[in-house]
Amino acid sequence: MGMQMKNFKKMMTLMALCLSVAITTSGYATTLPDIPEPLKNGTGAIDNNGVIYVGLGTAGTSWYKIDLKKQHKDWERIKSFPGGAREQSVSVFLNDELYVFGGVGKKNSESPLQVYSDVYKYSPVKNTWQKVDTISPVGLTGHTGVKLNETMVLITGGVNEHIFDKYFIDIAAAAADESEKNKVIYNYFNKPAKDYFFNKIVFIYNAKENTWKNAGELPGAGTAGSSSVMENNFLMLINGELKPGLRTDVIYRAMWDNDKLTWLKNSQLPPSPGEQQQEGLAGAFSGYSHGVLLVGGGANFPGAKQNYTNGKFYSHEGINKKWRDEVYGLVNGHWQYMGKMKQPLGYGVSVSYGDEVFLIGGENAKGKPVSSVTSFTMRDGNLLIK
């Protein structure tokens, strides 16, 4: 009887959440056309005039922009990126120019993948790209970044450049020998999280001075593939990988004040309905709408966390990757399950404008890039998806 009552209470709680934040479609939200080409593992940012820029990833060196203030909204192609095709870059607008940090790619068709530490900037006025005379203190792939003000960006997380590059060098060397290749793969994944040395240093780049500053370290392990947002000087660093295949459900929170980062109490993303624990997400979409932080999509390996807890370092071995469609919201200081997206999706671009969060491109459950653009908006306690 006690178990029945417990299950009944859980069911009623879930029903209450669904009633208070029911998903719907609405004319309130802005409808944007599809991107001209499918985009996953790309990057994007919005300027102070409401113009969104997206590119790289599966779009190669292509970049596109769309003006949200125009009555008739269409994507326009801008000058191609000169730094070569790459994925997992981070971009922000600083001093009215689009800055692109790092990424991963190949120098040529014969070379293995490698982590980049370069920086480029784009002038919307001149429609020109320029390589900035700087390199990041560490290689930047799987990192995340948020704009602090008009001249500074905070960048943290990401893989260890040397370990990551060595893996792809070894894979390339063993390409003709399947047995040797499998050995390289196993040896790479079969290590504890600490042995990957993911970056946990927080860097501040100042575009005006073209300088980098060490702003301390994350309060816990370094991550890759995290989502990050900044609102009212509060930074939220959401989940990510602790090592390849293993996510964390932890959300780091910090306050940026007087050029100093102060870490606050962590929180955790709740489990999805019907699941015992939250595996954590990599490649999730995120943004604020009417004071509610929304987190949706991403991907994980269900069961990897338990395997790792049980001592299996190659924690996602034999587990199929799962793209997620759940949406969570931080409502009045508490995380809640809000409902589902139109389809499972991750590794796209999140851009906020007003109280709308645009989800641009991404990777679907088949691992394919998509060109769709959807949006999250909170309205009268309801989550609107369009």
UniProtKB/Swiss-Prot annotation:
Catalyzed chemical reaction(s): N-acetyl-alpha-neuraminate = N-acetyl-beta-neuraminate
Domain of life according to the entry: Bacteria
Kelch repeat residues: 51-95, 97-149, 151-186, 187-232, 235-284, 306-355, 357-386
Gene3D superfamilies: Kelch-type beta propeller
Active-site residues from the entry: 241 (proton acceptor)
Localisation: Periplasm
Tagged with keyword Transit peptide: no
Pfam families: NANM
GO MF annotations, alphabetized: racemase and epimerase activity, acting on carbohydrates and derivatives
Keywords: Carbohydrate metabolism, Isomerase, Kelch repeat, Periplasm, Repeat, Signal
Keyword Amino-acid biosynthesis in annotation: no
InterPro entries per the UniProt record, alphabetical: Kelch-typ_b-propeller, NANM, NanM_proteobact
EC number: 5.1.3.24
Signal peptide: 1-29
Predominant location: periplasm
Any single GO CC term annotated in Swiss-Prot or TrEMBL for this entry: periplasmic space
Family that this chain belongs to: Belongs to the NanM family.
Subunit text: Homodimer.
HAMAP family, alphabetized: NanM
Biological role: Converts alpha-N-acetylneuranimic acid (Neu5Ac) to the beta-anomer, accelerating the equilibrium between the alpha- and beta-anomers. Probably facilitates sialidase-negative bacteria to compete successfully for limited amounts of extracellular Neu5Ac, which is likely taken up in the beta-anomer. In addition, the rapid removal of sialic acid from solution might be advantageous to the bacterium to damp down host responses.
Protein known as: N-acetylneuraminate epimerase
Protein species of origin: Salmonella schwarzengrund (strain CVM19633)
